Swiss-Prot record:
Annotated stretches, region: Disordered: 81-106
Polar residues bias spans: 81-90
Binding site for ATP: G159, G161, K162, T163
Keywords: ATP-binding, Cytoplasm, DNA replication, DNA-binding, Lipid-binding, Nucleotide-binding
Cysteines engaged in disulfide bonds, as pairs: none
Keyword DNA-binding assigned: yes
Chain intervals for the UniProt region annotation (Domain III, AAA+ region): 115-331
Protein name: Chromosomal replication initiator protein DnaA
Region (Domain I, interacts with DnaA modulators): 1-72
Keyword Mitochondrion belongs to the record: no
Organism in which the protein naturally occurs: Coxiella burnetii (strain RSA 493 / Nine Mile phase I)
UniProt remark on domains: Domain I is involved in oligomerization and binding regulators, domain II is flexibile and of varying length in different bacteria, domain III forms the AAA+ region, while domain IV binds dsDNA.
Length: 451
């Protein structure tokens, strides 16, 4: 391994600790490093979107790290490309740049046949920090299907808006040209269609249909894991569509390289375009989602009620909207106005359940009681070890046991920066491997919080 690429590997280790996992997977992980002339370092980005983002957000930090790691740091260059050893050949179905061949003639697929939900549009999608990158990428794909970011791979937890964005792209494509053949489906439907085709000796028709599409939108791609024949068929469908410059969008609950039971060649192809994450929405976005949904339902929702619901329902958009619909239904059936007190009563069983879930607040309380200090000590600026170590433990537990982002955890600990949280998590991880006392404390606290 050359010196520049060896330094890059060390740099990646620091970046992995400093950057939230979803950001690292989206922006840093797709980069390839190769040694260039005169001991320089060439970083290859898979597309313009990643290259621009690295230039704007991460290049300064990468340069700083390389300066710290070497007395003679390599000169960095950024460009679009991939390592020649990993460049797909024509035989491996690299997406070609020739003019796309017209799909076979056939009946136009309607919105209904395409399984596209006309209510899921970009206009009805509430944008926030947690999803703005995914929305921006989806918008680009909708404007230039088959050209910008193909495939587009969106990953994140349940109920965060992945499917909404997928439908929004489908709606936009069909609105521009209703003759386009667009299909949205769950990955299990693809498997079921293939099995049915095998049973009826109709694989040629199956292949002809799927490979004639202008846009294929597949949800929950992780369900292909362990299904070898389905993966084989999807592999060839994927290649055929990309060769014809037809758009593919995939969603998953995890980063593609983390899907156990998925062939490496598929994982590799999923990274040919752009991979973006959607994270749980922050408080302001949750409030905006509730206000937008209430407006769609033509219901007046006081802002303080939206704030109350958003503060207590933090997991995902689906549960947030479910809570709102319950409040609206109760108000409709009882004829009462929607107030904070009414909402608290309407959601009392849900709020009781939420209260039993692990929150940053009860982590702080549990850690403070365990170490016999005050919660206020965890939030204060004091740095003596008797307080600093419990604070680091509490931050690490909050990252492990809640869905909160690093900035949100930092805010909950006296307005600290997210890098402080990262340092705390790294320190606790290090101590767990070297200190039996810290390991015992960690196990005890996990048992208390999980029990």
């Amino acid at each position: 391994m050359s010196l520049p690429t060896s330094l890059w590997d060390k740099c990646l280790g620091y970046l992995r600790d400093e950057i939230p996992p979803q950001q690292y997977n989206t922006w840093i992980r797709p980069l390839h490093a190769i040694e260039s002339k005169q001991n320089g370092l060439l970083l290859l980005a898979p597309n313009r979107f990643v290259l621009d983002w690295i230039n704007e957000r991460f290049l300064n930090r990468i340069t700083e790290l390389l300066d710290e790691l070497s007395d003679t740091p390599p000169q960095i260059r950024l460009q679009i490309g991939s390592r020649s050893t990993e460049m797909p050949t024509k035989n491996s179905h690299e997406p070609s740049h020739r003019k796309a061949a017209a799909p076979p003639a056939g009946t136009t697929i309607s919105h209904t046949q395409a399984n596209i939900n006309s209510n899921f549009t970009f206009d009805s999608f509430v944008e926030g920090k947690s999803n703005q990158l995914a929305r921006a990428a989806a918008t680009q794909v909708a404007e230039n299907p088959g050209q910008a970011y193909n495939p587009l791979f969106i990953y994140g937890g349940v109920g965060l808006g992945k499917t909404h964005l997928m439908h929004a792209v489908g709606n936009a494509i069909l609105r521009k040209d209703s003759s386009k053949k667009v299909l949205y489906l769950h990955s299990e439907r693809f498997v079921a269609d293939m099995i049915k085709a095998l049973q009826h000796n109709a694989m040629n028709e199956f292949k002809r249909f799927y490979r004639s599409l202008n846009a294929l939108l597949i949800d929950d791609i992780q369900f292909f894991a362990g299904k070898d024949r389905s993966q084989e068929e999807f592999f060839h469908t994927f290649n055929a569509l990309l060769d014809g410059q037809q758009q593919i969008i995939l969603t998953c609950d995890r980063y593609p390289k983390e899907i156990n039971g998925l062939e490496e060649r598929l994982q590799s192809r999923f990274g040919w375009g752009l991979t973006v994450a959607i994270e749980p929405p922050e408080l302001e976005t949750r409030v905006a989602i509730l206000m937008s949904k209430a407006e769609q339902l033509k219901v007046h929702l006081p802002h303080e009620v939206a704030f109350f619901i958003a503060k207590h329902i933090q997991s995902n958009v689906r549960e947030l909207e479910g809570a709102l619909k319950r409040v609206i239904a109760n108000a409709h059936f009882t004829g009462q106005s929607i107030t904070v007190d009414f909402t608290r009563e309407a959601l009392k069983d849900l709020l009781t359940l939420q209260a039993r879930l692990i929150t940053i607040e009860n982590i702080q309380k549990t850690v403070a009681e365990y170490y016999k200090i005050k919660v206020a000590d965890l939030l204060a600026k004091r740095r003596n070890r008797s307080v600093a170590r419990p604070r680091q433990m509490a931050m690490a537990l909050a990252k492990e046991l809640t869905n909160h982002s690093l900035p949100e955890i930092g805010d909950a600990f006296g307005g600290r920066d997210h890098t402080t949280v990262l340092h705390a998590c790294r320190k606790v991880k290090e101590l767990l491997a070297t200190s039996l006392d810290i390991l015992e404390d960690y196990k005890n606290l996990m048992r208390i919080l999980s029990g």
